[in-house]
From Swiss-Prot:
Pfam families: Ala_racemase_C, Ala_racemase_N. Catalyzes the interconversion of L-alanine and D-alanine. May also act on other amino acids. This is Alanine racemase. PANTHER family: ALANINE RACEMASE (PTHR30511), ALANINE RACEMASE, CATABOLIC-RELATED (PTHR30511:SF0). The active site is at residues 34, 267. HAMAP family: Ala_racemase. Belongs to the alanine racemase family. It comes from Lawsonia intracellularis (strain PHE/MN1-00). Its cofactor is pyridoxal 5'-phosphate.
C-alpha cells in the first residue's frame, strides 16, 4: 500500500455552513454524497448531515447506500445509478435503499427479486426520465408508455420522479433548461394521475440557485455543499459565491535546493532557470491525485504566500520557485495544494481552471485515495 505524505483536512463547520446556506434557499434538500462524497469521505459527511437533521441523501451506487446502512444511518437513501445486478436488487430491497429505475433492465431486476423473494410486494422506487442529458432515464417523449408499464407492474411503487438538468448554470443555454423543465412538467402531470403521491426532484446545485421556481419537492445539491462555485467561469458566477471549501490539501517541503541559471528542473527539461533560483521540493504528486497538468502553471501556498510550480509534476514530488520568499521556508513546512487560509488560499475553481476541468473532478481526484492509500485525514 502506498503511504503518502499528503494530509487532507475536512472542515466540518464549513460543511455545516454550506448546508445551511442551501437550506436557506430551499429547505427540502437531498444532498448528493456519491463518489465518496466527492472525495470528502462519505461516512464523515453523512454523519454531519444526520446531525444537522437531513433526512434524505443521494448516493451513487447501492453499495454506497449499504455502507451507510451498516453505519446505522436511517435516512432515506436514493441510489442514483440504480441496480446493476440481482445482488444490487437484493441489497436495495432488504436494506431499504430506494433505487433509481432508469431503463427496463433495472426495472426487471427489482421486479424479479420482489416476485421470487418478497411475494410480489411492491418495492418503493424512483423513476428517472431523460429530458435532455442523454445519459440515464426513460424517454420523456414516451411517458404514456412508461405509465402503462408501471401500472401493470405491481411489484414496484413509484414514489419519486426525477430528471437531471444539463446546463442550468449557462445563461446562453436557458432555452435548453426551459425545455427540460417543460418536458419534466408534462411527464409529471401525467404520471401523477396514475400515482398521486409521487414526489419530484429536478435540480442540482446550479439549478437550486439559479432556477428556484423549478426545484420540485427535493433539490439534489452536490458541489456547492462542498464549497465549490457551480457557476465558476459563467456570467452567473455571483450566484455561487459565499460557499466555503470544505477540503484542504497540504504536503511537506522535503528539500530546498539552489538551481543555477541555465539549469533545467524536472523531467523532460520543460523549465530552465533564467537566473539562480531557490527551489522547494514538495512531497506530493500525481500519485496523490495532483494532476500532471499543473506542471509549470500551478501554484501552492506556503506561509500565506503563493509560489509557482516549475518543471513537471512527478509521481510523488513537485517543485516550486521560492526565490522571492519574504519569510524563511524550511524543510517540514506545509505547502497547501488546495486551501491555505487568507485571501491567497487556492480555491477548487482555480485548480480546475489550471487543470482544464471542473471543481468536482478536483475534489474527487485529490480525495479519491482516502481509505485506499495512507493519506493523513484530519477532521476539523
Amino acid at each position: 500500500m502506498y503511504s503518502s505524505s499528503v494530509c487532507i483536512k475536512i472542515h466540518l463547520e464549513r460543511l455545516r455552513y454550506n448546508l445551511r446556506i442551501l437550506r436557506s434557499r430551499y429547505p427540502n434538500v437531498m444532498p448528493v454524497i456519491k463518489a465518496n462524497a466527492y472525495g470528502h469521505g462519505i461516512r464523515v459527511v453523512a454523519n454531519v448531515l444526520r446531525d444537522e437533521g437531513v433526512q434524505h441523501m443521494a448516493v451513487g451506487s447501492i453499495t454506497e447506500g449499504f455502507l451507510l446502512r451498516q453505519e446505522g444511518h436511517q435516512a432515506f437513501l436514493l441510489a442514483l445509478l440504480g441496480p446493476f445486478s440481482e445482488e444490487d436488487a437484493r441489497i436495495a430491497v432488504v436494506h431499504n435503499i430506494t433505487p433509481v429505475i432508469h431503463n427496463i433492465e433495472s426495472l426487471q431486476s427489482i421486479v424479479h427479486y420482489s416476485r421470487v423473494h418478497q411475494g410480489g410486494t411492491a418495492v418503493p422506487v424512483a423513476i428517472k426520465i431523460d429530458t435532455g442529458m442523454g445519459r440515464l432515464g426513460f424517454s420523456s417523449n414516451d411517458y404514456i408508455s412508461l405509465i402503462d408499464l408501471l401500472r401493470h407492474t405491481p411489484e414496484v411503487n413509484p414514489i419519486l420522479l426525477l430528471s437531471h438538468l444539463v446546463a442550468p448554470e449557462i445563461s446562453s443555454l436557458d432555452n435548453v433548461t426551459h425545455n427540460q423543465v417543460e418536458q419534466f412538467a408534462r411527464a409529471y402531470k401525467a404520471i401523477k394521475e396514475a400515482f398521486p403521491t409521487i414526489k419530484t426532484s429536478l435540480t442540482n446545485s446550479p439549478g437550486l440557485l439559479a432556477w428556484p421556481n423549478y426545484i420540485g419537492d427535493f433539490s439534489r445539491p452536490g458541489i456547492a455543499l462542498y464549497g465549490g462555485n457551480p457557476f465558476y467561469g459563467t456570467s452567473r458566477v455571483s450566484l455561487g459565491k459565499g460557499f466555503l471549501p470544505v477540503m484542504e490539501v497540504e504536503a511537506p517541503v522535503v528539500a530546498i535546493n539552489t538551481v543555477s541559471a541555465g539549469s533545467s528542473i524536472g523531467y523532460g527539461c520543460t523549465y530552465y532557470a533564467k537566473e539562480d533560483i531557490r527551489v522547494a521540493v514538495i512531497g506530493a504528486g500525481y500519485a496523490d491525485g495532483y494532476s500532471r497538468s499543473f506542471s509549470n502553471k500551478g501554484w501552492v501556498v506556503i506561509k500565506g504566500k503563493r509560489y509557482r510550480i516549475v518543471g513537471r509534476v512527478c509521481m510523488q514530488m513537485l517543485m516550486v520557485d521560492i526565490t522571492n520568499s519574504h519569510s524563511k521556508i524550511s524543510i517540514g513546512d506545509k505547502a497547501f495544494l488546495l486551501g491555505g487560509g487568507g485571501s491567497l488560499a487556492i480555491k477548487p475553481e482555480e485548480l480546475a481552471e489550471w487543470w482544464g476541468t471542473i471543481p468536482h473532478e478536483v475534489c474527487c481526484s485529490l480525495g479519491s485515495s482516502i481509505g485506499a492509500q495512507q493519506k493523513q485525514l484530519v477532521i476539523i
